[in-house]
Amino acid sequence: MSIRIGYKASAEQFGPRDLVEYAVRAEELGLDSVTVSDHFLPWRHEGGHAPFALAWMAAVGERTNRVLIGTSVLTPTFRYNPAVIAQAFATMGLLYPGRIMLGVGTGEALNEIAVSGREWPEFKERFARLREAVDLIRDLWTKEGVSSDGPFYPTVDASIYDRPETPVKVYVAAGGPLVAKYAGRAGDGFIATSGKGMELYTEKLLPAVKEGAEKAGKTFEDVDRMLEVKVSYDRDPEAALENTRFWAPLSLTPEQKHSVDSATEMERLADELPIEQVAKRWIVASDPEQAVKQFRPYLEAGFNHFVVHGPGHDQERFLTQFTEDVVPLLRKLG
C-alpha cells in the first residue's frame, strides 16, 4: 500500500499569506497534499485567524504544480449554499485539473451560529443537510438544468457553465460510524482525526467505511483513507510538548464544545486545561523512530494518507525537521 503524506494548513492559527508560503514549502519538501481548515471564527480570540479557505486554495494552486489541494473540512450546509460551493470547486477543478478535493463535514456551532443567529441543530438534521448538499453538488457537476425540491436546498433549473470533465473528488469527515459508513458509500475519500483511541478507528470508523464502500459496489481501497495526524515533532523535547498549548481547544470534549459560539469562550474553556491533558491529543516526539512508532498503528488499521498538523508557531521549523527526520521513515512503511 502506497502512503501519501500531506500538510495541514491551520487557518485558525496563521494569516493567509503565511499559510500560502507554508503550502508552497510543503510541496518543495516533497509532500503530496495540502489541506486547509475552513473557519469563520478561530479556536482562540487572542492570536487567532480565520482567512477564507477558498481564496487561499486558489492562491496555492497558482504557486504550486503538483500537490493535491483541499479543505479539511468545509461545511456546505449553513453559511454556504451548496450550489455556490459546487460552482467554486468546479472553477478550481478547471484551473488546477486533478489537484482539487472538497472535504466536507456536518459542521460545528462555532462557525455557523455567528452568521445565522439560529440555534445549533441536532446531529440528525446536520447529517440530513450534508447528504442533500453532497447530492446537489454532484448533480450540478454532472447535469444541466438541475431542479431539486429538497427540504433544505431547493433549486430551479440550475446549471454550472464551467466545470471540469472529471468532477472534483469529495471527501467526507466522520467521527462516528454512521457518517463513516456514508463516507465509504458516497465519498471518494474519508477523513478522520488522530488521537481519539485506536478502538474508534479499528472497531468503528474503518469497518464502517468498508461496509459503506461495499454497499456501493466499491472496494475499501477505492476510498482514500485520510487521517489528519496531530503531531508535535521537534528535536527539542521541551518545545515539542509546549507547542501543543495553542491547540488546547482540541482537548475539550464534544459536550463542552457543542453550543460554544464565540472564540473568546472557546479560549477561556481551553486555557483551564493542564498541558498534560492538552498534549494527549497529540503525538509528541523528538525522536524520529518514536514518532514513526506512533504512526504505525494507524497504518496497520487501514489509513493510507497522513496529513500532518504541527501545532507550533514556527511552521518552517516543523516542516523542515519533520520532512528530514520522519517522512523518509514513513515512506519506507508503504
UniProtKB/Swiss-Prot annotation:
Highest taxon, organism lineage: Bacteria
SUPFAM superfamilies to which the protein is assigned, alphabetical: Bacterial luciferase-like
Catalysed reactions, semicolon-separated: oxidized coenzyme F420-(gamma-L-Glu)(n) + D-glucose 6-phosphate + H(+) = 6-phospho-D-glucono-1,5-lactone + reduced coenzyme F420-(gamma-L-Glu)(n)
Positions of substrate binding: T193, K196, K257, R281
EC class name: oxidoreductase
Biological-process GO terms, alphabetical: carbohydrate metabolic process
Record's keyword annotation contains Chaperone: no
Active site: H39, E108
Binding site for coenzyme F420-(gamma-Glu)n: D38, T75, T106, G107, N111, G175, G176, L178, V179
Enzyme Commission no: 1.1.98.2
Subunit details: Homodimer.
Protein family according to the UniProt entry: Belongs to the F420-dependent glucose-6-phosphate dehydrogenase family.
Function: Catalyzes the coenzyme F420-dependent oxidation of glucose 6-phosphate (G6P) to 6-phosphogluconolactone.
Protein name: F420-dependent glucose-6-phosphate dehydrogenase
Organism: Kribbella flavida (strain DSM 17836 / JCM 10339 / NBRC 14399)
Gene that specifies this protein: fgd
